[in-house]
Amino acid sequence: MPKYRSATTTHGRNMAGARALWRATGMTDSDFGKPIIAVVNSFTQFVPGHVHLRDLGKLVAEQIEASGGVAKEFNTIAVDDGIAMGHGGMLYSLPSRELIADSVEYMVNAHCADAMVCISNCDKITPGMLMASLRLNIPVIFVSGGPMEAGKTKLSDKIIKLDLVDAMIQGADPKVSDDQSNQVERSACPTCGSCSGMFTANSMNCLTEALGLSQPGNGSLLATHADRKQLFLNAGKRIVELTKRYYEQNDESALPRNIASKAAFENAMTLDIAMGGSTNTVLHLLAAAQEAEIDFTMSDIDKLSRKVPQLCKVAPSTQKYHMEDVHRAGGVLGILGELDRAGLLNRNVKNVLGLTLPQTLEQYDITVTQDEAVKKMFRAGPAGIRTTQAFSQDCRWDSLDDDRAAGCIRSLEYAYSKDGGLAVLYGNFAENGCIVKTAGVDDSILKFTGPAKVYESQDEAVEAILGGKVVEGDVVVIRYEGPKGGPGMQEMLYPTSFLKSMGLGKACALITDGRFSGGTSGLSIGHVSPEAASGGTIALIEDGDTIAIDIPNRSIQLQLSEAEIAARREAQEARGDKAWTPKNRQRQVSFALRAYASLATSADKGAVRDKSKLGG
């Protein structure tokens, strides 16, 4: 029978000092012996996805204590990728994932907490907490802050839906008036919550449902809606049950590594492909799998991407649907229900509610459930009122979107495409693979060949795009922006958005060893591995080289002979200490970022730290 971890600090005469300090936090004699549960919050006023989380930790804590546990709350950092985008701040985004994971480990292990409730929401916070949860392997439940309502405004006498990406594109489009750009900017992000499309934050919060670590509705129920409060209340109650099951009944099925199994990871990736999630999710699932000691690699993702269709299409791949529409169509369980009927899921998995996948679908799939409360929950909709307050409205759609032929979520028969929303490409300068969000690629450019325009930084590429130096048919290559080379693997949302601003969204390709925002669409290929700074062939591409992209056949090729590539590699090595570094880039890199770069692996490994360098 496992012993409560917290007993290390609460039992025995020699722990009198620790108990004295616990008493100073408000604990009493009756609390010693109860499970101590960490409420891992991430409130900050810097991030709209987290600005409303201040009081939500207290909600969870109250339920923990009412259910027989002791709750102790702390916060992690949280970086807003959108605000950090397009300048040196983006160097810090991906490294913050590792800091978040480590900080959770530090706090939980230093204080011997028995379990956790993770209150996350945005891009690196959910992955960081997920990595920590699987590393620590103590009972955990995730409950996120929820999606933002979609922006809405009237342009040319037509009401349109908006999000952050629209503001970025119109702000750089010389054909758009100042008044219209200002109108879009003011309308794009109307409420608290994670950005309203299927960007990285919402993708990851959906995937925690598929992994079994969060409750139904977690990925799609709006941050502003009153119904979301119940997820927090339930999490506080349920975590005490899970904790007691493990420590008092020796039930290891309550542990995250047994819930988020290899089968669950495959289901999560299947969901990701079917819903056209952010390419960043690939990076984060690979990293989380390593923490769980699960053999889940790019090869597994490649195999899944070849058989899973696209059943859901959401912004940025279309402006017709946002997360509020996904929720109305049944949310994550709506998509999983269609995948299950298509025979594409592993059914022998459970979630934090203790339900198997078939049991969960029977209760929460809107096309089969008889539970009116569930149907009511999925009718939770937007209010269209600017606010930073959680649970501030109770608006509902008049009806559910259960049209699987022409609605937001489709059945296999009516899939948006037989190929899924993400694909892994391989070739002679992406030997270990690269990722493209096919959901956002126009059919006309699924095969694309063109001359390379090579840039050693995102900044240089942006200047060239806005300066008219990139023209129709070009393949923009941005290198030395990988985990090590950046360092930090910057997102390339500005270059892709500015290509659209210049009318080149369907006329050019962009390839990088960096990564893309979940808000990116177009022929944008990232995560090229090995990266340039690790000796990747992407470092050998020169202006004018022909690059051939063939998404249907999962191929990407630099059209040079092996002899020419070998000669260029020899010339690169001859640079000595300067080999595999950018030639003319001026960039200030802090000690903290240099420390990150010294251990960073390429994207095909999840950009995690290279344990072999630490002897581990």
Swiss-Prot record:
It comes from the Bacteria. Mg(2+) binds at D81, D123, K124, E491. The keyword Amino-acid biosynthesis applies. NCBIfam families: ilvD, PRK12448.1. Homodimer. This is Dihydroxy-acid dehydratase. Keywords: 2Fe-2S, Amino-acid biosynthesis, Branched-chain amino acid biosynthesis, Iron, Iron-sulfur, Lyase, Magnesium, Metal-binding. The keyword Amino-acid biosynthesis applies. It comes from Salmonella newport (strain SL254). Functions in the biosynthesis of branched-chain amino acids. Catalyzes the dehydration of (2R,3R)-2,3-dihydroxy-3-methylpentanoate (2,3-dihydroxy-3-methylvalerate) into 2-oxo-3-methylpentanoate (2-oxo-3-methylvalerate) and of (2R)-2,3-dihydroxy-3-methylbutanoate (2,3-dihydroxyisovalerate) into 2-oxo-3-methylbutanoate (2-oxoisovalerate), the penultimate precursor to L-isoleucine and L-valine, respectively. Pathway: Amino-acid biosynthesis; L-isoleucine biosynthesis; L-isoleucine from 2-oxobutanoate: step 3/4; Amino-acid biosynthesis; L-valine biosynthesis; L-valine from pyruvate: step 3/4. Its EC number is 4.2.1.9. The active site is at S517. InterPro entries: Dihydro-acid_dehy_C, DihydroxyA_deHydtase, DiOHA_6PGluconate_deHydtase_CS, ILV_EDD_C, ILV_EDD_N, IlvD/EDD_N. Belongs to the IlvD/Edd family.
